[in-house]
Amino acid sequence: MSLTRLLIRDFRNIETADLALSPGFNFLVGANGSGKTSVLEAIYTLGHGRAFRSLQIGCVIRHEQEAFVLHGRLQGEERETAIGLTKDKQGDSKVRIDGTDGHKVAELAHLMPMQLITPEGFTLLNGGPKYRRAFLDWGCFHNEPGFFTAWSNLKRLLKQRNAALRQVTRYEQLRPWDKELIPLAEQISTWRAEYSAGIAADMDDTCKQFLPEFSLTFSFQRGWEKETEYAEVLERNFERDRQLTYTAHGPHKADLRIRADGAPVEDTLSRGQLKLLMCALRLAQGEFLTRESGRRCLYLIDDFASELDDERRGLLASRLKATQSQVFVSAISAEHVIDMSDENSKMFTVEKGKITD
């Protein structure tokens, strides 16, 4: 699946843009603040319903406008799909697929699997466990049809259970919630464990190519003690949970621990090495999706040249080309990306929200 056409209206500093895109590499070149990252963010928002730089809708809609509008055309092997997203200042969204309204953002996410690599993406490695849970959950969402519903129900039940912890005095009063929560927690944990095991070889191979000087290990932690039933953990920790007023153990506390030579990667790797590792993990995830389902990711890479020397940029470019995926790359100068260009690439110049090719 590739994005062949992109229409942007009143998004960030872009009043209007209508772009015909390459199924291969698309380069966005311009000075800082020109709007090149806004194009990447528009694509991301079209596939996620939210921006990656700000959760405040007022920051995303162009100044003095009431809503942004994004439209795209996706070309698959057998058919073309028209998609659209409109979002107003109140945060109300309208999703359109093939001319019909009433669709969910999750449907857009399924149609447009994408990997985002930004200068802020180090949080995957040096941020809290929630960022690595999101990494695992992306894979589960695209590989397990029932994952999104189970995950949504889990979030709802945990919220209800945490509210109940402020009211109850005996564990028996929590059983109605735990009866539903326990099988969901175990199923989600199983999916995550299977996904982390399945992608392990891809992560290992890609990381060896990008960072051969380190021995990297990946360990999935499910969020409660190994070899212990979740039902037992919940009942045993009732008094502590009641004092905390939240559920201290479960899949919402899971993590993917990543170590280099036995130590946490954030304590061992330089910023350039952390970026290489982040890129390696995103590539591995995309390649695993292609092998398992035949679907390809869109790759969005903001500020391609930052933290990477010429050799590492060349390595990343060659691996991206090998995926045969659609890639969007922003850079301050065309010199940073010209070596990646070929006859199928498109180069866009961005200046003050205006985009030309």
UniProtKB/Swiss-Prot annotation:
GO terms for biological process: DNA replication; DNA synthesis involved in DNA repair; double-strand break repair; SOS response. One of its GO terms (molecular function) is ATP binding. PROSITE patterns: RECF_1, RECF_2. InterPro entries: DNA-binding_RecF, DNA-binding_RecF_CS, P-loop_NTPase, RecF/RecN/SMC_N, RecF_2. ATP binds at G30, A31, N32, G33, S34, G35, K36, T37. SUPFAM superfamilies: P-loop containing nucleoside triphosphate hydrolases. Its main location: cytoplasm. Keywords: ATP-binding, Cytoplasm, DNA damage, DNA repair, DNA replication, DNA-binding, Nucleotide-binding, SOS response. It is found in: Cytoplasm. GO terms for cellular component: cytoplasm. The keyword Transmembrane helix does not apply. The keyword DNA damage applies. Gene3D superfamilies: P-loop containing nucleotide triphosphate hydrolases, RecF/RecN/SMC, N-terminal domain. The RecF protein is involved in DNA metabolism; it is required for DNA replication and normal SOS inducibility. RecF binds preferentially to single-stranded, linear DNA. It also seems to bind ATP. Belongs to the RecF family. This is DNA replication and repair protein RecF. It comes from Shigella flexneri serotype 5b (strain 8401). The lineage of its organism: Bacteria, Pseudomonadati, Pseudomonadota, Gammaproteobacteria, Enterobacterales.
